[in-house]
Amino acid sequence: MYFVIRRSSNNQYYFVIKSENHEIVATSETYIYKASAELTIDSIKREINYNSDVIDTTV
């Protein structure tokens, strides 16, 4: 499982959780600040798998 941070059409941030075979498992709500999305990802990683990769497509 890994996370991909993206930007929505209204310039807010969201992330998708993808499985090892690259299928989307879940999509988050949108966040005004990228830091908010990152904090949510960290929270999920603590509960599931802290070694999950995060790919930031917004940079």
Residues of each region from the PLM?
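Short arginine-rich
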Residues: 44-54
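Short, tandemly repeated low-complexity microdomains enriched for cysteine and small residues
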Residues: 26-31, 52-58
